[in-house]
A protein has these predicted regions:
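N-terminal Rossmann-like or analogous alpha/beta NTP/dinucleotide-binding catalytic cores
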Residues: 1-104
Length: 104
């Protein structure tokens, strides 16, 4: 069977809900069917106004309660913003992206 890498990337703007739990379970089941597969967890905390530490903790404890484990230290998306900006600027400089001039 081919090695599979899945990821679950919830946003900590609320508690873990049934839809997110379902997605996490599907990814975990896919990972569990093949010993070489991985499940990575990334916390999408880029909505600074609504993201809260208590919601992140609720998501993590909910996943543990469901018996879902992951294969990495959870990545915190906002910790990577400088790398994202670096890559975006490189794409702009190389002519592979453009800045949106829309008002909204």
């Amino acid at each position: 069977m081919t090695k599979m890498i899945t990821r679950f990337a919830p946003s900590p703007t609320g508690n873990l809900h049934i839809g997110s739990a379902r997605t996490a379970l599907i990814n975990y089941i896919c990972k569990s069917k093949n010993n070489d597969s991985k499940l990575y967890l990334r916390i999408e905390d880029t909505d600074k106004d609504r993201s809260k530490e208590e919601f992140k903790n609720n998501i993590l404890s909910g996943l543990k309660w469901l018996g879902i484990d992951w294969d990495n230290e959870p990545q915190i998306q906002s910790h990577n913003i400088n790398r994202h900006l670096e890559i975006a600027n490189k794409l702009l400089d190389n002519g592979n992206a453009f800045k949106c001039v829309c008002s909204e």
